C-alpha cells in the first residue's frame, strides 16, 4: 500500500521590522560572463532549485491580512508569509527588455550605466498593492541574454529580506550553482545555511538577540513615539511634494577610495572621528545642496535640510541574531541629521583639498548613525508592537522644498564575492571564478534626493578602489552636479 505524505502549510506574520518594508520588492541585477549561455542557464537553474529546496520559504507567498474587531475593519494590513511542502519549484526564465541590450564587452567599456537597467528588465514592479486579495511571490528570477554573457535579475519581497539578506541568498545561489561544475569529491556544502523556517521565528529571534545585549528599558507609548519622531513617525508630518514636475533621472558616480581615506585621516587628526561612509555622504549632500540652491531664483522657506540614512542594526545584535544560521530579515533602522542650509552651502564650496572644513557635516551624519544602539532597536521594536497600524509608521517624508536627502548603503554587502563557478566565468575552460562583472540597481526616474552606495568591489590595498554611488535627482540638478568642480574633485580620476 502506498504511503500518503502529510503536506504542511505554515504561515506567520512577518516581524514588526519586516512589516515596515512589506509594500515593495528589492530588485537587483548581476552582470555575468557566459561563454556557453545554455550551459550557464542550466547551471543557474539547478543552483536555484537547490537553494530553494534548502530554504522552502523562498517558494512561499505573501498575503496581506486585515484584522477585524467588533465587526469593524481595522486600518492595519499586515503581511503574512505562507509556505507549503508542495510549492512548485521556481523557474529561471528569459526576459528581454524592449530595447536591445549592448554586448558584455560594450557594457564593460561603458561601466554598466544605470540607464541600461530599465523597468522592463524585471518580472515584478517595485511597489505592491497591499489592498489586493492576491498573494505575492517571495522571489522571482529572470535573465536577459547579452552577447558574451547574461544579466541575472532578482526580485525579492522586501518584507522577507533586506539587502544583507539578499546578499546571503545570492551567495548561496552562487555556491549551489558552482557545485554543478565540481566533481562529487570536490563538492562542499555551504557551512552556514539559514534556518529553513527562518521567517516563522523572526520576532522571537529579534527579542532573544536584543535581550542578550540590551539593558531593559520601559517607557510608555507616547514617550517612545516622541523618541523616534525624527526616524519613524505615526503621521507623515511633512506632506510630500506635489508641485515639482521636473524630469527626474539617475546616474552612477565613481568616487575615489584613496581620497576618502585621506579625508578620514585629516579629519581624525583634527579630532573628528568619522567613517568613510559619513565623509562620502557629507561630500555629496553638501555639494548637492549648494548646486540645488544656486540654481533657484528663490530660497526655500526653511533654514534646515534633513539627511536620513538607513542603518543596518545587525552589528548591534551579533552574534546572537545569527543563531541558528544567518538572519535574513530586516534589521534596518533610520538615523536623521538636520543641518542648516548655510552650513551645507559653505561646506559645499570646499573641495577635496579643503576637507577639514567639512567636519561639522560629516560629524553630524556620523553622530546620528551612532544613536542606533541595541537599546534603540529594543525600544523601537517595542514601540512597533504597541502601535495598532505599523504600516502608518514610515520614514518621515522629505519636505516639499527639495532640500532633503536620503542615503542607503549596501557597500559592504559581498555581492562581488559570489562565485557562480566556471560556467559563469570569463574563461570557462580554465575553471576560473564566476564572479559578477557588475552589480546594479534598477534605473529610477521618479526620485529626487536619493542615493544608494552600491556594493564595493574589493581591491588590493595599494590600488585606488572605486566606490560607486547611485544618485537620483531632478535631471537639471544632476547635470549641474556632474559638471561641478567641487563635487568632481571627489571622483576617481
UniProtKB/Swiss-Prot annotation:
EC numbers for this chain: 2.3.1.-
The entry's keywords: Acyltransferase, Transferase
Secretion signal span: none
Reported induction: Expression is positively regulated by the TRI6 and TRI10 core trichothecenes biosynthesis gene cluster transcription factor.
Region (Disordered): 180-199
One of the Pfam families matching this protein, by short name: Transferase
UniProt feature, compositional bias: Polar residues: 180-191
Single GO MF annotation: acyltransferase activity, transferring groups other than amino-acyl groups
Pathway: Sesquiterpene biosynthesis; trichothecene biosynthesis
InterPro entries: CAT-like_dom_sf (IPR023213), Plant_Fungal_Acyltransferase (IPR050317)
PANTHER family: FATTY ALCOHOL:CAFFEOYL-COA ACYLTRANSFERASE, TRICHOTHECENE 3-O-ACETYLTRANSFERASE
Role summary: The biosynthesis of trichothecenes begins with the cyclization of farnesyl diphosphate to trichodiene and is catalyzed by the trichodiene synthase TRI5. Trichodiene undergoes a series of oxygenations catalyzed by the cytochrome P450 monooxygenase TRI4.
More info: Trichothecenes are sesquiterpenoid toxins that act by inhibiting protein biosynthesis.
Protein's UniProt name: Trichothecene 8-O-acetyltransferase
Amino acid at each position: 500500500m502506498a504511503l500518503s505524505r502529510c503536506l504542511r502549510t505554515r504561515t506567520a506574520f512577518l516581524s514588526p521590522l519586516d512589516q515596515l518594508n512589506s509594500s515593495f520588492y528589492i530588485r537587483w541585477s548581476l552582470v555575468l560572463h557566459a561563454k556557453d549561455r545554455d550551459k550557464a542557464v542550466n547551471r543557474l537553474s539547478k543552483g536555484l532549485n537547490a537553494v530553494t529546496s534548502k530554504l522552502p520559504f523562498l517558494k512561499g507567498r505573501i498575503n496581506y491580512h486585515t484584522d477585524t474587531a467588533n465587526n469593524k475593519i481595522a486600518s492595519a494590513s499586515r503581511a503574512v508569509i505562507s509556505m507549503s511542502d508542495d510549492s512548485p519549484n521556481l523557474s529561471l526564465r528569459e526576459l528581454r527588455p524592449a530595447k536591445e541590450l549592448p554586448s558584455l564587452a560594450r557594457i564593460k567599456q561603458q561601466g554598466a550605466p544605470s540607464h541600461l537597467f530599465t523597468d522592463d528588465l524585471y518580472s515584478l514592479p517595485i511597489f505592491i498593492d497591499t489592498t489586493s486579495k492576491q498573494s505575492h511571490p517571495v522571489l522571482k528570477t529572470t535573465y536577459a541574454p547579452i552577447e558574451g554573457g547574461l544579466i541575472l535579475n532578482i526580485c525579492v519581497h522586501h518584507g522577507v529580506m533586506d539587502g544583507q539578506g539578499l546578499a546571503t541568498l545570492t551567495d548561496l545561489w552562487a555556491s549551489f550553482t558552482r557545485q554543478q561544475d565540481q566533481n562529487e569529491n570536490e563538492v562542499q556544502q555551504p557551512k552556514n545555511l539559514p534556518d529553513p523556517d527562518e521567517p516563522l521565528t523572526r520576532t522571537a529571534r529579534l527579542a532573544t538577540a536584543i535581550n542578550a545585549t540590551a539593558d531593559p528599558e520601559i517607557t510608555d507609548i507616547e514617550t517612545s513615539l516622541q523618541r523616534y519622531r525624527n526616524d519613524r513617525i505615526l503621521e507623515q508630518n511633512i506632506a510630500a511634494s506635489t508641485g515639482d514636475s521636473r524630469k527626474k533621472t539617475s546616474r552612477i558616480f565613481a568616487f575615489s577610495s584613496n581620497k576618502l581615506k585621506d579625508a578620514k585621516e585629516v579629519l581624525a587628526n583634527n579630532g573628528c572621528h568619522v567613517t568613510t561612509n559619513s565623509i562620502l555622504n557629507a561630500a555629496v549632500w553638501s555639494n548637492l545642496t549648494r548646486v540645488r540652491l544656486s540654481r533657484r531664483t528663490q530660497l526655500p522657506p526653511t533654514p534646515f535640510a534633513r539627511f536620513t540614512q538607513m542603518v543596518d542594526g545587525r552589528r548591534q545584535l551579533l552574534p546572537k541574531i545569527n543563531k541558528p544560521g544567518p538572519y535574513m530579515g530586516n534589521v534596518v533602522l533610520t538615523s536623521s541629521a538636520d543641518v542648516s542650509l548655510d552650513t551645507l552651502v559653505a561646506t559645499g564650496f570646499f573641495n577635496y583639498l579643503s576637507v577639514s572644513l567639512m567636519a561639522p557635516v560629516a560629524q553630524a551624519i556620523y553622530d546620528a548613525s551612532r544613536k542606533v544602539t541595541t537599546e534603540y532597536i529594543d525600544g523601537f521594536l517595542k514601540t512597533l508592537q504597541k502601535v495598532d497600524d505599523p504600516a502608518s509608521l514610515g520614514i518621515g517624508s522629505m519636505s516639499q522644498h527639495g532640500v532633503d536627502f536620503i542615503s542607503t548603503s549596501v557597500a559592504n554587502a559581498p555581492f562581488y564575492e559570489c562565485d557562480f563557478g566556471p560556467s559563469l566565468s570569463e574563461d570557462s575552460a580554465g575553471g576560473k571564478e564566476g564572479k559578477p562583472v557588475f552589480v546594479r540597481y534598477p534605473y529610477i526616474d521618479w526620485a529626487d534626493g536619493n542615493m544608494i552606495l552600491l556594493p564595493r568591489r574589493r581591491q588590493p590595498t595599494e590600488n585606488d578602489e572605486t566606490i560607486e554611488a547611485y544618485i537620483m535627482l531632478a535631471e537639471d540638478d544632476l547635470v549641474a552636479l556632474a559638471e561641478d568642480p567641487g563635487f568632481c574633485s571627489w571622483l576617481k580620476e
